[in-house]
Every structure is written in C-alpha cells, then in structure tokens.
Amino acid sequence: MARRVLGQGHPGALPLWEHFVLNELHARLQTRDVRYWRDKQGHEVDFVLARRGRHPVAIECTWSVDAFEPAGMRSFRGRYPEGESFVVAPDAVPASTRTVGGVRVRFVDLETLVRALGKR
C-alpha cells in the first residue's frame, strides 16, 4: 500500500510500511504482544513478538529483500538466540530462507508473515 501511495524512494514510505505492518499484526493476530527492540549501540529490530512462554520472534520491515541490513537482527539474535527471524517485504514472493550476516532469516511478504505467525 505505502509503495503504491508514496513510491519506494519517498522518505516517508518506509515508516508508512512499518506502521501498516504493525496495524496488520495487531488486527489479524489479535495481539498486543508486539514490541520494539533497540540496544545502546543503536541497533534495532522493528518488531518483536514476545508471547509468554515462547521464544521471541524478530521482524524487520524493508522495501525489498535486497535492502535488508542484518546488523540489528544480528545484535538481537546475539542476545536472544532462540526464535524465528523474519524480514517482511512486498517483493518477498516466493518466501525464502537464507543466512544473512550469520543470522538465519525468513524473507516473506505480509500475508505470509501473518499466516506464519497465526499458526503459533
């Protein structure tokens, strides 16, 4: 949606995409267990699904799979090694899994992310 409205290169497009993903997670998963993570060095993960008794799920939003920068995810997984790591991007079709920067990451579109998280 944000990609259509503002265009990929627009400076406000990525925050709009992140907000859209957050709204979809809240609405479709019916949860408020979505958090944000940032360390003192400035590494961050857009969203962390922190459900009681389960390993944290890390979610990064990006416009394309090629634009993913693994520093935040790597720092998060260094501290919390258990759990899945997702990158949600409009062009992540078909979904794929690969290791980037030493972290195993699943690249998915938004619909695939919601379906995968809904099964947990």
What role is predicted for each listed range?
Residues 1-120:
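A cross-kingdom feature that marks ATP-driven nucleic-acid transaction machinery
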